[in-house]
Amino acid sequence: KVHVAVGEYLIVKLPDGQLVPRKSDDVNATERPFVGMPMDDLARELRVGPLAEFKVKKSKHYIYIYNTSEAFNRAAVVILESMFNGVNTYVRNMGAKTTAPDVPLVVIMFKSRSEYQEYFRIDPSIIAYYHILNNRVVMCEETPLARVDQALADQQLISTIAHEGVHQILHNIGAQSRMSAWPMWITEGFAEYLAPTTVGNNRRWKGAGQVNDMRMMELEVQIKARDNANWTGDMISESVTARQLTSVGYATSWGLTHY
């Protein structure tokens, strides 16, 4: 399926959801409709190499490939499954048209940092991400912050899972087009707006538009720590023009989107 044409190249969507480049001359057009890979086939294709011994769970829209604890897997599944319908409904109520995903949504969960980094080298501070090209959310149960503050680490992890899950949902229901260029503060601020979570024994998604406790706390700390009355304006200016956001930038982007 052609995602976009770029000069003499096409960006093609494969049945497993990945986007890959192809020369226009190497592609033959067909009238057959695009059909995503069946879940069983995709799960089998994913469970090779470092993922060969991982467990598999499937739902209507998701395939979970994991070797984490069952408790962590359950918490992530509850959040992602509840968000899928909730975010979809919220976006439709805003007046946007949505469509059902045409490929299974893949979520890969690693127990250890070493396995996570071996699968894909990434900044050690990143504990979960949505990969725009392969369409997968990848996360790790073990976080560096846990050695310092387990409660805060849990809150950060659950919040990040929801955030990356929102990115995956929006890019698969037609609300955002993969590889499209949006201002960073809008893309990340809207994801934070849709992804607030609770922590403790009842880890769950709070609902789109509810106060994002993690980001509210960060804004409060930052504002109280500053004496300069102009600093808030500077913080906003820096965030809306940034190509890459700091943690404070994420909090500011959420605040701008929420209020």
Regions found by a protein language model. Name each.
Residues 1-94, 120, 214, 220:
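Compositionally biased alpha-helical segments
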Residues 16, 96-99, 207:
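Sparse recognition of residues in long alpha-helices and their boundaries
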Residues 51-183:
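Juxtacatalytic substrate-recognition/specificity segment
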Residues 19, 116, 200:
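Flexible, glycine-rich phosphate/dinucleotide-binding loops
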Residues 49-50, 122, 128-143, 153-156, ...:
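Acidic/His/Gly-enriched intrinsically disordered linker/tail segments
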Residues 7, 104-105, 254:
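Short, surface-exposed beta-edge/turn micro-motifs
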